[in-house]
Each structure stands twice: as structure tokens, then as C-alpha cells.
Amino acid sequence: APDYILCDESVHDDLVLALQKNISQFFVEGVDAAKKDYCSIANEHHFNRLKDALANALSDGATLVCGGETSKEGLHLTPAVLTDVNYNNSIMKEEIFGPILPIIKVQSLDESINYVNENEKPLALYLFSNKPAVHSEVLKKTSSGGMVINDCVLHHMNPNLPFGGINNSGVGSYHGKFGFDAFSHHKAVLKSSSISPFKVMLPPY
């Protein structure tokens, strides 16, 4: 799941409304009624980690605009959407690995690019724009493990594309031949002929 959204202020409110509408439709009868269609958090440790991260962000000034409901039984947490998140809060500095989505309001494309570049390189960058010039600029000025334009996660489903991170988000790639190469050792073997270059490289000259 994406760790955060950098959203232009001109469409911020529309995005929040759209997320509220879609999440409320899925959980119209609450999280317990939706459990058969919605997976739980992997274990209690990560469930508590996510609850603590959410509580910490809220205590640091963030606003919960929808979601964040926990099930009475099991380890279910509805997708929590946050606004007004402090840039320096830990939820913006670590990979969340859970259904919590902070939305950061930005005033320009440059501000978004600068934020991405000032933090750890992401496993994936998802860009939503209908402007080819914006596509090119973000592609040239940012570094990420992968990039998808106007969608999410689809590159992970294509066996012909390498999937992997860069720096802290991962090393190497897998899928198809990329995975075979990543888990293979390319052994260098050189057999020198009788005409060795060292004959002219070593003294006496």
C-alpha cells in the first residue's frame, strides 16, 4: 500500500471526499460485517504497531477523516485516511505496511518532487496526472524502485517488468528472468592464451 499521498491543494478536498465515499460504501455496516471480504492484520504485534502509529499521528495534530475502526474480534482495521499530518511525524518517515494513508497538501509539483527526494527512496512511486510533461519531469527528477502512472501496483503484476526497490527500499529485482538473475551467481571465467598481456606490461620494458 502507498505510504502517503502528496496532493495538490486544488484537488485535496475532492480527493478526501472521494476516499470517504468509497471507504464508507465498503464498510457500510461496520468492520465486523465486512470481515469476510477484508483481510486482517498479520499478527497482534503489527496490529498494535499500527494502532500506536495512528494514535501518535493524531496526537501530533493529524485529523482522521475516515476509517480507523477496529474489529471487536480479530485483527481488523479499516483504512484510515489522515490529513493535516506533521511532516516530521514518524508515520511519514517509516514504511507503514498497513491500512493507514496520510495525505499531505502541496502547492506545486516542485514541492512534491523535493519531498520525495529529501526522504528515503520509495519502493514504488505512483503518479496521477494527465500531462505528459509532468510524467517526464517526475521520472527524470525522482528515484524509486518502480513507477506507475495513473494507477497503483500494476507493475508488480507484469512478469515482464522487474520488481524491486532501491537503497533502503530494497536491493535487486525479481519476476521472470530478473528474478533468475537476482538469485543466480554470474561467475567470471577467463582463460588466458599463450600471448599474455603481462609480457608487455611487466619489466624489463
Residue ranges and their predicted role:
Residues 69, 76-205:
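Conserved C-terminal structural/oligomerization subdomain of aldehyde/semialdehyde dehydrogenase
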Residues 9-121:
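NAD(P)-dependent aldehyde/semialdehyde dehydrogenase
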Residues 5-6:
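Short internal beta-strands
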